[in-house]
Structures are given as structure tokens and as C-alpha cells.
Amino acid sequence: MPVLHLKSIEDTTLWKQLKSGFTGDDANIAQTLASNLLGICEEAQDRMRAFPTLHPQYTLHDETHLLRVTELMAMVIPSDVLTGLNPIELTLLILSAHFHDQGMVLEKPELDALLNDPNFRIFRENWEIEHPNRRELRNRLSDKTLTEDARDNLRRIACELDAAMLTDFVRQTHAERSAEYVRARYGSDPRWNVAGVNIAELVARLCLSHFESAHKLRPENGFRFDECVGTYRINMVYAGLVLRLADIMDFDRDRTPDALYRTIDFTSRISLREWEKHRSVQGWVINRQLVQYTLRCEHPEYERAAREFMDWIDRELADAADIVRQFPAGFSKYRWELPLKSRPVPHRAEEQRLRLQRSGVYPFTG
């Protein structure tokens, strides 16, 4: 992990603020929550480590993603807004970062059941129609003149595409599965109780929201500006916006552009495993003037895929700004200061970009 050197939740800005950023009664509650989060977040990370999601060579999420999303949350929230969040809001953000993608984890019985699901068979057939390169690989594998090395390479590529297809299927319901997991696993866990209220339901709603339109973060869908937990008021709309943007800013790996899948065939130098490496961000600049990335892209297809991510981030930035702009007057402290869309790198940086391109590193702005 080249940029955010995070080994545990204790290294994140949000947890440090929860642990040490309060006084009086708030400090007592905050420190209890911070202590509870150590074990809870470790459980979330262990679950990601223990179950390679879809294929041992293509694990969809890992504990690194959870920690990075947690830290990116602190980067997208203005610093004075962050220090003004109450202990429950900080806790909800940390928990949602750690549980929003738990639905991508398939345990063995679930995977076996899914493979026999008629809906999955239909999905697979349609996916192969839309991705003729997969069918072409199958035909090539039937060639008896192939060398063993060539056959092994084709099998590897086929496995990558099969994992991508399965990922696409699971992705459709992973937010609901994440919410269900939180409710079932932690709905009666006393570590999740604050002032007599178990906050698993609030975390479940946030998990569910991150895969839906940002404009569904509305009171009628369970997202209020003044959700009450004991004497604390929680802005669930703001928490939902922060989660979804931090998630995609980690180049969330279940959002690999479909166009990249279509480029993979038996002659291609494109590999999903290689894309996984290149997807890793080498540097961020995130402030009110600029959201800028530096990624390592050694193939035009990886650059094209990365630029698609920039387009997604632009849409999320615009949606978030629009929603926050409509907050009631009493909630104006929850500001959003990130730029609305991509901005060009200044001229000197553009010259640097050309130099970096020659060495295989591409800065992107989004």
C-alpha cells in the first residue's frame, strides 16, 4: 500500500479523533466506542482475509480497502467539519467503511448455492453473449495442438474472466447482503449499543445506500438529518455521501469497467491481475481546489479504465455538492468543499505528466 500506510484502525484519522478529540461526558462515550471498534474492525478485516471471495487468484476485497476507505473519509470531510462530528457520527463512518462490502464475501455454502441458482445460469449465458472473448477462449482451449504453456495461459485468462463474471453477478446484491450481515451478526451485540440503542440498523442502512443513487439519501428512505441516538443527533445523509465517495475514491475494485473485460483474449497483454496492481493509487491530492490522483498505468487500456473511474468520481462529486447545497439551514455546518468535477493540472504539472508518462506513471485528475 504505497500511499496510506495503515496497519490497523488505530492508524486512521477518524479513530484518533474518536479516541482523543472529546472532553467530559462525550469523552467517556467516545473512548468506549473507540475501544469497542478495535475488536469489531478486526473482525471485519479477518472476514475479508479468511474468505477469498470468488477465486483464489482474484480476491475482490481485502482489509486494505476497509482501512483506506476509512482514511479517505477523513480526507473528503473538511477538517473543521470532522472535528465537529459527534462520537456516534464518527463511529458510524468507521463501521460503514468496514462493513459496506461484506456482502461481496461468499462463504463456501453460499457459493455452492449460487452456482446452482437458475438466475445465475441465465446471467452467465447473457454475460458470455455480451463478452464473445470468453467463448473464443473456450474454443481455443479445445485446440489439441496447443502447447501446455499456452493452455495454462488460456486457463488463467479464462479464470480471470469467469471471476469477473461472477463478480458482476454478486455485485448486484452485495449492498443488501452487507446490510443483512450487519443486522444478523451485530443486531444484538452489546458493543454496538450507545445510550441503550443498538446502531447496527443505522450501519446497515448506510451499507445499503452506497450502491444506490445518492439522491435516495432522503428521509423517506430512512436517512434523516437529525436521526437521534440517545441525546446525539446524527446526519445520516452526510454520512451516506461520505461513505460512497470515499469508497469510489479507493478505485473500488468491484467497479472495474466492463470495457476492460472485453479487451481480454488469448492474444491480449491485458490482465485483471495486472489491472489490480495498476489500480493501486500512488498518490492523492484531495482538497477544496483539486482532487488529483497519480496511478501507474503501463498500458493504454489501464489508462482508459482509470479515466472511467474519474468520470464516476466526477458524477459523485457533483451529486454530493447538489445534495449538501439543499441541506436545511439548521445543518449548514455539514459542508462539502471538494471541487465539482475534474480540474486540469497546471502547466508545469502537465510538463511533469509528459515526463512521467515516459517512465510509465500517469497522474490523473478527477
Residue ranges and their predicted role:
Residues 83-286:
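Divalent metal-dependent catalytic cores for phosphoryl transfer on phosphate-bearing substrates
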Residues 1-22, 26-41, 225-366:
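C-terminal effector/catalytic modules and regulatory tails appended to multi-domain proteins
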Residues 2-110, 114-156, 160, 349-366:
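Acidic/His-rich, divalent-metal-binding segments that scaffold phosphate/diphosphate chemistry
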Residues 64-79, 181-184, 188, 312-326:
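Zn2+-dependent metallopeptidase catalytic core
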